[in-house]
Amino acid sequence: YITLEMAEEKIAERIDANLLNVNIQDITDLPKPMFDSRVTNLAQKTQGSLIIKEYPTASAHSGHFRALLQDLFLKKSFTPDIIFIDYLNICASSRYKAGSNVNSYSYIKAIAEELRGLAVETNLPIVSATQTTRSGFGSSDVDLTDTSESFGLPATADLMFALISTEELEGLNQIMVKQLKNRYNDPTINKRFVVGIDRSKMRLYDCEQSAQNDILDNGQEEEYNADEKKLKKSFEGFKY
């Protein structure tokens, strides 16, 4: 996990709250015996390694990340399965110097291309984030044109989705995910779906299927017939 925004310790607190099932504001007050017990129980379920590395905002680019991966491999024999970068727009570019006379479209596009190149080179998925424009910030139906600063970013990404929150969804402790671009599959399949969110524990979780029924896309609505064990599509009655 590479962060250019929050401190390493704050990122670790969020992950601890998720794994230990404790409200994030209670992490520092958790009694040591309870902490040890939860860590022991967690270790029995799963094993893994997480490296959190902080860089100053707008100071690190793909070259720094490549050097970090090489350093971890040589000194700790550590090779990640996935890389999270928080977040793309505040990375630097290895091709453009900071303060150079370059527009935001070209600069952000260059960062996206460099990170994608790093992903291809290392054969690792890289997940990052961006923000929306002001008009997209309050929108309940975000699309690719709402990407802030540079449309070159969605042009470069392989998979892109939006996290959408409204007052109604907040009341249900849910967040909507909308596929904006998908090079690996048909983006109209499960184009919109909701997941549960527990902000106090920094956790996402699956929702019941009934929660998905209200957001099915037109033309994609399907009804599952349990008796016949088949999917009946809403356009089944069409005649050719």
Go through each PLM region and give its residues:
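Cytosolic-facing regulatory segments adjacent to core modules
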Residues: 1-79, 147, 192-193
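Flexible glycine-/small-residue-rich
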Residues: 3, 54-56, 87, 179-181, ...
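Conserved H-loop
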Residues: 4-6, 128-131
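C-terminal regions of RecA-like/P-loop NTPase motor modules
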Residues: 21, 43, 63-80, 97-99, ...
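Flexible beta-alpha connector loops of hexameric P-loop NTPases
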Residues: 24-31, 53-59, 93-109, 136-145
